[in-house]
């Protein structure tokens, strides 16, 4: 859910939406950001919970899933939240993403779309193709890959550090948006 940008757009476009996050700060920021008047009949629900267990959503009831999960152990969004996958090692992160993919498949209607934005990471100078690992997890759960969009990133917080010649490696200046369909 982050700061609620997708939920704000849904409200402005008169769409129903459910936003979830494990981080209480993100929840409160989103709640504040959604507190504006506009003519809408949309239903906007926000929940403090993990995408690994969205028990309150019925099977085959969601039209579209859009998600941008945190990456494994890169930017930590909390200190001790046991549901925060940003705190996990790559191996545990991928296990958590398998649960997210299962739940996403369960709640999404057939012939509808799931879009997930995720990028690769670098640990100790070694590239970890996290995006493709996550893509394969979603495919293994039954999703059909329809498209891959490469989103270029600009003005990243640590770009100046990366550009430094002494580090001698290519920038990770993109993320993938994987477009899946549930058949």
Language-model-derived ranges and their functions:
Residues 1-183:
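Class I S-adenosyl-L-methionine-dependent methyltransferase catalytic core
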